A protein has these predicted regions:
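A broadly tuned preference for mixed-charge, low-complexity surface segments
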Residues: 82-97, 136-150, 234-247
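Generic surface-pattern signal
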Residues: 25-29, 96, 148, 168-175, ...
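Active-site-adjacent alpha-helix immediately C-terminal to a catalytic or transition-state-stabilizing loop
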Residues: 164-231
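Phosphate-handling substructures
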Residues: 44-45, 50-55, 94-170
C-alpha cells in the first residue's frame, strides 16, 4: 500500500467536522450502528471532461483522510459509493485511516463497493438534465422544482420515487450490519453527490435547499431508535422516515 499523503489538519477548513460530530454524538446516545449518506470530498471542476469524471483535488484527498482520522479506529466501517471515482476514492481514503485491528495494527484493506442507488440513477436523460440545471438559478432551485413536479418526467424520475429508492437501499445496508469483536460501533459510508443530499434532505422534512448548503463531506445519518427508522442532519433536525420507504 502506498504511504498516505501527509496533511496538515489545521489548514483544511471545517469540511466534515460537523458530520463527524453528529455521528459521535449519536453513538454516545446509545445507537450502535448507522448509515451515512454523504457528499464526496473536494473535487475538480474541469470543463474538458464529463462532470462525473472530475476527480478529487489533493485537498479533497487530505480532507477525506482527516475525516477518517477523526472517526477513529474503533469503528467497524464499510464503504459504498456512486460510480463516480471521486465518490469511491472518498470512501477508500476515509476507511484507510480506520483500518486497524484490535491490536492497533493495520488490517486488510477494505474495498468500496459501487451501488447505483448512490449515483445519478434518477436522471433519465442526462443531457437534458444538465441543460435544465444550467437554465435553473442554481442546483437548489433545480431540486426545488424537481420536488414540485416541475421537471419533465422523461428527464428526471419522480423525486419521491427516487427518495424512496435511496432510503430503501440505506435501510437494507442498516439491516445487514453485524458486530465485530473489538469495535463498539458500526458505520456504513454511502458516498454520493450534492444533488442526492439536497433531494433527500428536503423531501423527508429536514433543511430545504434554500436554508442550508450541502458542503463537501456533509452527510445524513440513518439509524434505528425506539422502533423507528430515523435520519438526522448535522444542522440539528431529525425525522422518522418509515413512511417514505415502500417496503
Amino acid at each position: 500500500m502506498e504511504k498516505d499523503h501527509l496533511h496538515n489538519p489545521d489548514s483544511l477548513g471545517d469540511y466534515g467536522l460537523e458530520t463527524v460530530k453528529m455521528i459521535k454524538d449519536r453513538f454516545a446516545k446509545g445507537v450502535d450502528r448507522g448509515i451515512l449518506l454523504m457528499r464526496h470530498s473536494a473535487r475538480e471542476y474541469r470543463r474538458d471532461i464529463h462532470d462525473l469524471q472530475n476527480p478529487l483535488t489533493e485537498r479533497g484527498r487530505d480532507l477525506a483522510l482527516r475525516m477518517g482520522d477523526m472517526l477513529g479506529a474503533d469503528l467497524k466501517m464499510r464503504g459504498f459509493a456512486s460510480t463516480a471515482q471521486r465518490c469511491i476514492d472518498t470512501a477508500d481514503l476515509i476507511m484507510r485511516r480506520t483500518e486497524r485491528d484490535v491490536r492497533g495494527e493495520r488490517s486488510k484493506t477494505r474495498v468500496t463497493r459501487v451501488i447505483e442507488a448512490f449515483g445519478v440513477f434518477y436522471a433519465l436523460d442526462q443531457v437534458r438534465m444538465w441543460k435544465s440545471l444550467q437554465a435553473a438559478d442554481g442546483l437548489d432551485s433545480f431540486v426545488a422544482k424537481w420536488l414540485k413536479g416541475e421537471v419533465a418526467p422523461d428527464v428526471m424520475m419522480p423525486a419521491r420515487v427516487a427518495v424512496s429508492q435511496i432510503l430503501s437501499v440505506m435501510k437494507g445496508r442498516l439491516l445487514t450490519i453485524s458486530s465485530e469483536k473489538g469495535r463498539s460501533h458500526s458505520l456504513d459510508l454511502c458516498v454520493s453527490h450534492d444533488m442526492t443530499l439536497y433531494l433527500v434532505r428536503q423531501a423527508i422534512g429536514l433543511e430545504t435547499t434554500f436554508e442550508q448548503p450541502v458542503n463537501y463531506l456533509d452527510g445524513l445519518l440513518m439509524f434505528e431508535t425506539d422502533g423507528e427508522l430515523r435520519v438526522s442532519s448535522h444542522y440539528g433536525k431529525e425525522v422518522c422516515v418509515d413512511d417514505f420507504i415502500n417496503t
